[in-house]
């Protein structure tokens, strides 16, 4: 077996042990026991890792993506990277409950000698730009991997892991042949990756020519151009402070989708329920 294959298998085996539960959407309120466990995990992580939060990583068009980095304190050797890039909320501080969120994945990675890097997709939370599921995910993913490979603490080997939307962009970026893209674990990427006219598609929007209603409901909560944004000159320290005080997750009113999805034309469904204008307005 080739050395590169062995390295990839070892990377995948190690990353599989890191359950990326931090990026799942929140359920019920955490118990006191769970909050205590979160605090203990965060304290241990702080003792083992160099932590850089709200690093604004530049993309080729000048927009910057908000990124948190956790890497081993031992600087004697360069380390491989586990990379999670997501449209969902990974803020290190649970503003509602006044405690750290679950940082188990980050801690597990650092203990195994990996850096753990998580980035919000453009147009989400502290990242700049406007979210476009049909355009920027591929170029942003490739740019992020190249940026990480060039960091002085990196061994230029980046592996990705993630579920659903966080899985689908991996497949498209892998096809570009970035030499630093060493391994990938796309979990639950059932939506698929294809093309819609000139655009690469990050989701199976059409089946037999019919729009899939699942993605209309998903976009209702994910593609919101009307959101709070910080000035480009906001310091890293101020962004970190803001992330402890404000939860930028939108609180979308509930929708009876069994009725809403019967609206015609389909392109106006989100508008009809008071949602963001989204891609159908373009």
Show where each model-derived region lies:
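Bacterial N-terminal signal peptides
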Residues: 7-18
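N-terminal cap/lid segment of alpha/beta-hydrolase-fold proteins
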Residues: 35-75
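Alpha/beta-hydrolase fold nucleophile elbow
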Residues: 153-165
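Cap/lid segment of the alpha/beta-hydrolase catalytic domain
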Residues: 73-149, 198-199
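Boundary at the C-terminal end of the N-terminal hydrophobic targeting segment
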Residues: 22-26
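Accessory cap/linker subdomain of secreted extracellular hydrolases
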Residues: 27, 40, 102, 111, ...
């Amino acid at each position: 077996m080739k050395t590169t294959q062995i390295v990839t298998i070892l990377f995948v085996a190690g990353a599989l042990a890191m359950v990326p539960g931090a990026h799942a959407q929140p359920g019920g309120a955490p118990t006191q026991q769970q909050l205590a466990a979160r605090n203990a995990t965060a304290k241990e992580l702080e003792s083992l890792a160099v932590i850089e939060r709200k690093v604004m990583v530049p993309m080729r068009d000048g927009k910057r993506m908000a990124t948190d980095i956790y890497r081993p304190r031992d600087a004697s050797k360069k380390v491989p990277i586990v990379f999670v890039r997501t449209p969902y909320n990974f803020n290190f501080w649970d503003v509602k409950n006044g405690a750290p969120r679950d940082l188990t994945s980050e801690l597990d990675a650092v203990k195994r000698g990996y850096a753990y890097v998580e980035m919000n997709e453009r147009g989400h939370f502290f990242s700049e730009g406007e979210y476009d599921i049909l355009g920027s995910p591929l170029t942003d993913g490739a740019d992020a991997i190249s940026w990480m490979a060039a960091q002085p603490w990196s061994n230029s080997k980046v592996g990705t892991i993630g579920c659903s939307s966080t899985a689908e962009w991996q497949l498209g970026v892998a096809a570009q042949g970035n030499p630093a893209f060493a391994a990938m674990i796309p979990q639950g990427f059932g939506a698929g990756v294809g093309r819609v006219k000139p655009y690469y598609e990050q989701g199976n929007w059409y089946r037999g020519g019919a729009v899939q209603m699942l993605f209309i409901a998903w976009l209702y909560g994910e593609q919101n151009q009307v959101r709070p944004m910080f000035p480009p000159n906001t310091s890293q320290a101020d962004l970190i402070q803001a992330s402890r005080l404000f939860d930028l997750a939108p609180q979308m009113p509930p929708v009876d989708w069994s009725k809403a999805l019967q609206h015609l034309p389909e392109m106006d469904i989100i508008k009809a329920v008071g949602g963001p204008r989204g891609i159908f307005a373009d």
